Amino acid sequence: MLLLPRCPVIGRIVRSKFRSGLIRNHSPVIFTVSKLSTQRPLLFNSAVNLWNQAQKDITHKKSVEQFSSAPKVKTQVKKTSKAPTLSELKILKDLFRYIWPKGNNKVRIRVLIALGLLISAKILNVQVPFFFKQTIDSMNIAWDDPTVALPAAIGLTILCYGVARFGSVLFGELRNAVFAKVAQNAIRTVSLQTFQHLMKLDLGWHLSRQTGGLTRAMDRGTKGISQVLTAMVFHIIPISFEISVVCGILTYQFGASFAAITFSTMLLYSIFTIKTTAWRTHFRRDANKADNKAASVALDSLINFEAVKYFNNEKYLADKYNGSLMNYRDSQIKVSQSLAFLNSGQNLIFTTALTAMMYMGCTGVIGGNLTVGDLVLINQLVFQLSVPLNFLGSVYRDLKQSLIDMETLFKLRKNEVKIKNAERPLMLPENVPYDITFENVTFGYHPDRKILKNASFTIPAGWKTAIVGSSGSGKSTILKLVFRFYDPESGRILINGRDIKEYDIDALRKVIGVVPQDTPLFNDTIWENVKFGRIDATDEEVITVVEKAQLAPLIKKLPQGFDTIVGERGLMISGGEKQRLAIARVLLKNARIMFFDEATSALDTHTEQALLRTIRDNFTSGSRTSVYIAHRLRTIADADKIIVLDNGRVREEGKHLELLAMPGSLYRELWTIQEDLDHLENELKDQQEL
């Protein structure tokens, strides 16, 4: 429904657009006549909506007609194959490179010292039951026998018992202390390399991932490295060594029967543990997926807090978050239940073996083949074996879980870096303006939807060039391609006559400055956000660019000045202040190519004009190549060159007056609509004054 007011200007504009077929399929809009002064924002915004709809209809008319007349093609949905998993041995092999790094003798010496302390601790630990046996046997004699050993000898045996036990603990703790630096360095190196690899991946990869799940996976992966190293160095290797020594002692001291029971127990215990843990693994994977999903929902909701409040969707997101938590709860219940089954089975196997060995030992004592000290030795050795056996089960479970967590982390490192340097990259010439040329460039974010279609144009060096067109015509895509966030599917992009793929990526991006529509800010101080433009800038340079960007008045009003925290994504400051901060940041970078990606589209007219004056004062023509991506044509009317995009192709090129004089010009149609809206706004101002 569209109610026309008595205002002749409004009626004339709207009726003319209906007659020309420029406005259709519009959303219901209501213009009110009474209380015009209080309804001006509603009226003007409604008019802007009409213009946006008209603009879309003009620029997409041909493509819609072509689509409606084109034969329909059936699309086939490809089944996604299951992502290959990294083998556990491959993960351990990759991790070993950080424990035994090439050329780092200091780390290797630490590993060897830790290994020596480990062996010493276990040898002393095995000696403890022997000293205990000797003490028991020396007490089980007739004290009136003149051949009885002196009490001092017994005391020495007890002293050796204590020294062996304390020495075992001491060497074990020293091993932990020596190896701690090796483990932490490995964790730091893997985490840093993973972070650096992720920063090399293309923008498309990052946009297709949920940040919450990604950060949670990295956090679990780094913790998994610590757990794997702890399991391997502090448990698996010591346990294996101790079990081998104990089995050898039992075989040598008490015969093949004890050895057979020990071997059978170890074999059955290991098989049961491995099989059951493998069965439990998919429960842990399901729990991790649910945990990632819950973290992503929570993070997205908190980041988009304002949007949640705008649409009153707290309950919807709470239900969504609760659903993820319910899935995580169900998976964790299965993990706990399967853990109880595993623990019960392990204890049953060990208790059965211990009972059998104690029965055989008691039979030997009754038959006179073994002493009471031997029985105590068997009991101590078996119980001493039970400790590493119990650890073996729990450690193996933790090891499997950690390997699952590490699998995701290491798979992140396997993602291919698509945007790479040439074998011998070139450096860009310094202190000269750059021209940019697109030669038959075709690109799309999805294979079935091309954004740029065989686009060719030139942005002359030192000129102020504007790129205009409807939403989705490819304006911002041009920036992403020049910056090499993506590479074109076909065609070439040249800077000063050379393909940008020949240039060093860091050098290329160093000469390009960007003032985006939505300024990305860190949850840090104003000072740090400005200095992010060039980390090595001096304090004087930062203050200078802040003054040039007219950000100084704001900073003087703030109680904490430069130390004011801007909040998450800069939510604590206004849109105009964010844009001024972005300009200050780019001024500090001092780039030779400047992109303004609809930098003022979200601002009011007063703030927009102030920012445009700031931009004109600091980015004069001739000194830099500047590219303005804009919807509001008045902001770029003074451009040296205007490129009009339509459905991914270059529709028109020229200066403002040339394009207005061109018959059937799309630019002229868009300009006329905007001028009518501006005239409408002026009429409304006049009526308000009356």
Curated annotation (Swiss-Prot):
Residues 111-401 form the ABC transmembrane type-1 domain. InterPro entries: AAA+_ATPase (IPR003593), ABC1_TM_dom (IPR011527), ABC1_TM_sf (IPR036640), ABC_transporter-like_ATP-bd (IPR003439), ABC_transporter-like_CS (IPR017871), P-loop_NTPase (IPR027417), Type_1_exporter (IPR039421). GO terms for biological process: intracellular iron ion homeostasis; iron-sulfur cluster assembly; iron-sulfur cluster export from the mitochondrion; iron-sulfur cluster transmembrane transport; mitochondrial transmembrane transport; transmembrane transport. GO terms for molecular function: ABC-type transporter activity; ATP binding; ATP hydrolysis activity; ATPase-coupled transmembrane transporter activity. The chain crosses the membrane at residues 111-132, 156-179, 229-252, 254-274, 341-359, 375-396. Belongs to the ABC transporter superfamily. ABCB family. Heavy Metal importer (TC 3.A.1.210) subfamily. This is Iron-sulfur clusters transporter ATM1, mitochondrial. The gene is ATM1.
